[in-house]
C-alpha cells in the first residue's frame, strides 16, 4: 500500500481502498496484525513515505468512525524489502507489554527465505557475532566475539525446492539488525534479491525474498496464545516450490 495521506482525507472510499490492499490477519481490542508487502516501511523515515503504522491508524479511524486521534504502537519492525507479519498495539498497555516480550524473546518468529545455493546441511543452527555499521546500514558476521559484536543465533531448515532455488525456514533465537540476511549470507546462502548481502541481482520490485511467515506469543492482556500465519506473496516464484 503506497499512499500519500493528506490532511482531512477521510470517508468510506479511503477505508475501502485500504481494506482491499492491506491484509489484516488478526485483530482484537488490544492488537492488530498485518501482512506487510515488500516496499512498505513500518515506521516513518527520512524518505517521507507514508509508513504502515500511519496507514493502519487511518484504517482503524475509518473502520470504527473514531472522531479523535487513534493510538497505534509499533512493537517491532521489518526491513522495507521484507514482507510478512507485523504486530501493532492498539493500547498503551499492550504496547508496553509487547515491547518487553519482544525484548526478552518471548515472541516466536519464523521466516521463509528463498536462496540460490543449497546449505551444506539441510538443517542446523547458526551462531555468529554481528557488528552493525550504522553508516552503511549493514551488519557483518564473525565466527568469534569481536569488539562491539552481539551474539546472533538462528535455526534453519530446508523445506522446499524448485528448479532454480531453495526454500529455507528460519527460526530466530535473537533479534539482531539484518540478522537473517547477514547470517545466511555468511553461510554462503544469500537471499534472492539481496544485493547488500551478496546476491548477484536485485528483484524487479526491489524486494528481497524474505517473508515473516509465522508468529506466536501469549496475548499481552488476555494471556491467550496467539498464533498467526501470513500467506506468501502471490508470485510464481513463491508458489513454485515442491515442499520437502
Residue ranges and their predicted role:
Residues 1-244:
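RNA pseudouridine synthases
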Amino acid at each position: 500500500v503506497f499512499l500519500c495521506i493528506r490532511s482531512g482525507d477521510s470517508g468510506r472510499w479511503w477505508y475501502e481502498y485500504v481494506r482491499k490492499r492491506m491484509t489484516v490477519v488478526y485483530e482484537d481490542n488490544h492488537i492488530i496484525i498485518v501482512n506487510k508487502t515488500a516496499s512498505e516501511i513500518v515506521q516513518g523515515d527520512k524518505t517521507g513515505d507514508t509508513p504502515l503504522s500511519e496507514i493502519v491508524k487511518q484504517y482503524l479511524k475509518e473502520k470504527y468512525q473514531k472522531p479523535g486521534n487513534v493510538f497505534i504502537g509499533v512493537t517491532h519492525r521489518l526491513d522495507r524489502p521484507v514482507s510478512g507479519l507485523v504486530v501493532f498495539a492498539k493500547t498503551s498497555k499492550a504496547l508496553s507489554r509487547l515491547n518487553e516480550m519482544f525484548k526478552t524473546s518471548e515472541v516466536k518468529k519464523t521466516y521463509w527465505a528463498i536462496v540460490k545455493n543449497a546449505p551444506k546441511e539441510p538443517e542446523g543452527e547458526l551462531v555468529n557475532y554481528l557488528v552493525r555499521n550504522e553508516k552503511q546500514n549493514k551488519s557483518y558476521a564473525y565466527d568469534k566475539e569481536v569488539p562491539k559484536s552481539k551474539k546472533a543465533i538462528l535455526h534453519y531448515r530446508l523445506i522446499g525446492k524448485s528448479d532454480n532455488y531453495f526454500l529455507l525456514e528460519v527460526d530466530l533465537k535473537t533479534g539482531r539488525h539484518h540478522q537473517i540476511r547477514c547470517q545466511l549470507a555468511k553461510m554462503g546462502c544469500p537471499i534472492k534479491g539481496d544485493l547488500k548481502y551478496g546476491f548477484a541481482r536485485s528483484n524487479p520490485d526491489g524486494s528481497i525474498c524474505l517473508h515473516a511467515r509465522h508468529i506466536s506469543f501469549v496475548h499481552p492482556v488476555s494471556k491467550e496464545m496467539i498464533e498467526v500465519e501470513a500467506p506468501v506473496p502471490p508470485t510464481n516464484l513463491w508458489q513454485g516450490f515442491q515442499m520437502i
